[in-house]
């Protein structure tokens, strides 16, 4: 299992309503990029062996300073980055410095990444490949299994990296089916919605954590059971 920690940004253009709202709530509460790195440090101290991926947008990193960000991200124990608004044409900005710092730079592939562009996008990818199962914003639709299977196969012909599928996965059953087509499933919006609902109900941090843990355990159990069928 891996944990993806979102770094809040005021204009999260690739995210759906749930994560957009969460990002704005975090900013309103005073969360910053530095604060996100402090959370990463706390996580790493408690869970030394679980891979931790930082996901976000380039603007806050640019303002923070790329060199300082990579230094602090490494010190915090991050294993990789998913920066959704930096295409390979902009590798000099963050991808190249990340790789020099031994930080995985994870690429996103969408259903519209076709032809010669696929190997170009994946040329400097590391860690794993994040396949976006639908075109558009996160957490709003679910793609047909056949189209996902075909896309994963197409990616695997170009790269030996694990292919993990995300966007629109909301149930344990969906997670198990999608994970069986590749190397894993990413669930974000559904988790964020549980946190938002708990917040609206004024539940304690412990109660919220338990609800999230129960949900993510159901995902992991379903994926594991499906693999052993």
Describe these PLM feature segments.
Residues 3-6, 73, 121, 178, ...:
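Conserved, mostly hydrophobic/aromatic
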Residues 10-21, 31-41, 62-68, 83-100, ...:
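Active-site-adjacent beta->alpha loops and helix N-cap segments on the catalytic face
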Residues 113-122, 165, 169-185:
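Catalytic cores of alpha/beta
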Residues 102-139:
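Histidine/lysine/aspartate-rich catalytic loop segments that bind and position anionic ligands
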Residues 17-53, 96-110, 146-163, 210-228:
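Alpha-helix-loop-beta-strand connector modules within alpha/beta enzyme cores
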Residues 73-79, 99-106, 123-129, 181-185:
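Glycine-enriched alpha-helix->loop->beta-strand junction motifs that scaffold or abut catalytic
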Residues 1-12, 80-82, 131-139, 168, ...:
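Glycine-rich phosphate-binding active-site loops on the catalytic face of alpha/beta enzymes
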Residues 58-76, 181-189:
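Short, electropositive alpha-helical surface patch
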């Amino acid at each position: 299992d891996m944990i993806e920690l979102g770094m809040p940004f005021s204009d999260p253009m690739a995210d759906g309503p749930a994560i957009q709202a969460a990002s704005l709530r975090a900013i309103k509460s005073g969360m910053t990029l530095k604060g996100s790195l402090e959370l990463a440090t706390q996580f790493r101290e408690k869970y030394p062996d679980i891979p931790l991926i930082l996901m976000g947008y380039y603007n806050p990193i640019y303002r923070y300073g790329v060199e300082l960000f990579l230094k602090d991200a490494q010190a915090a124990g991050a294993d990789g980055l998913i920066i959704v608004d930096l295409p390979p044409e902009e590798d000099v900005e963050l991808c190249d410095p990340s790789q020099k710092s031994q930080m995985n730079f994870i690429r996103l592939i969408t259903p519209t990444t076709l032809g010669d562009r696929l190997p170009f996008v994946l040329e400097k990818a590391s860690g794993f490949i994040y396949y976006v199962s639908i075109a558009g914003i996160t957490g709003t639709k679910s793609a047909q299994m056949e189209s996902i299977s075909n896309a994963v196969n197409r990616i695997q012909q170009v790269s030996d990296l694990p292919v993990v599928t995300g966007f629109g996965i909301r149930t344990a059953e969906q997670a198990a089916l999608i994970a069986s087509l590749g190397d894993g499933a990413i669930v974000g919006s559904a988790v964020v919605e549980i946190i938002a609902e708990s917040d609206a109900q004024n539940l304690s941090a412990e109660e919220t954590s338990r609800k999230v843990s129960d949900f993510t355990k159901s995902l992991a159990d379903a994926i594991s059971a499906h693999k052993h069928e």
